[in-house]
């Protein structure tokens, strides 16, 4: 039997295993867990991961190349670089803007980055890690995104960038944010880690800014276990991001390749001797943030299902929102940003001030009913313990940010949930509020 025959046999056995082990289990109310997020994988994902492992090419290779190309086609950008997580993607995106190759536009310590405090820490942390000052403005409820009308008041001569996330897949007001970025010559980074497939005015989010990022953690729209990607329309920024990702080296050869530039031994950079091997010449203080080809193989299979996943998220969101209309005396339900079509990551809920309900009581009740909940990440980031010694600036009041910290949580709408799950969720909310009983 040849190696190829064995590969085919292994692939068939993997498919048989997947069909047996990964088939959805029947939903049993009160017994089955309704998680806030999760992965949906099947035979193709396992088959491609096994195929990648049989290749024996452990770092980025043919599967990664195919994944980057296909993701770029889906988003509508020419340059995609995979990395180890969405947080790493954010770190690379922001750090790239500190490159001396950008001349006067390079971010320098003490420069300011406008953002929000109601979100995930690693949207903001890269600014701090690069010696920059985060400047916080408040958000809007029920979109949970930056209140774009407050941004211009935050702009000073030190302002150099805007870096914000599309909260739980709901696009922020891109037309206004883009207008302000253009007016004041600010870089714009779109954190799309929770928003793969979201569009604004019919255009994919992540393509309005200078750089976009996405995450492939199991909770997200598609997964490769861990993993993320940075993407851009700019060839210059692509090379800088790649350098920071790959140890800071000036060379951009793919793994296993040499002399792509044709000048490997023909350059003199820094105070190195003439002809010093370009493969070991470093122009940035970089990292090693690449993924394995097995991860990319899983992601490639997931990309074949991304449109299906996005549509199911939208359908689950609409179904749940319709079901929870019975509870609007107590709950403020989410709204899509005008001109956006969100690929929802989760379903955010805020308790109304008049509800007379404590959030802890409600989420504890849901937890006991096996319905998973999550808070809106850090709540108000500046109230987190690690922010005690961080230098930052706040413009105006963070009233809604504090309200989110105290009264908001979210529940799941990921593609692994069926209408049976969602009907059960609605029934438990109604039971808690004493409705329809």
UniProtKB/Swiss-Prot annotation:
GO biological process assignments: O antigen biosynthetic process; polysaccharide biosynthetic process
Pathway note: Bacterial outer membrane biogenesis; LPS O-antigen biosynthesis
Single GO MF descriptor: transaminase activity
Entry annotated with the keyword DNA-binding: no
UniProt-listed InterPro entries: DegT/StrS_aminotransferase, PyrdxlP-dep_Trfase, PyrdxlP-dep_Trfase_major, PyrdxlP-dep_Trfase_small
Family: Belongs to the DegT/DnrJ/EryC1 family.
Protein's name according to its UniProt entry: Lipopolysaccharide biosynthesis protein RfbH
Organism for this UniProt entry: Salmonella typhimurium (strain LT2 / SGSC1412 / ATCC 700720)
Gene transcribed to yield this protein: rfbH
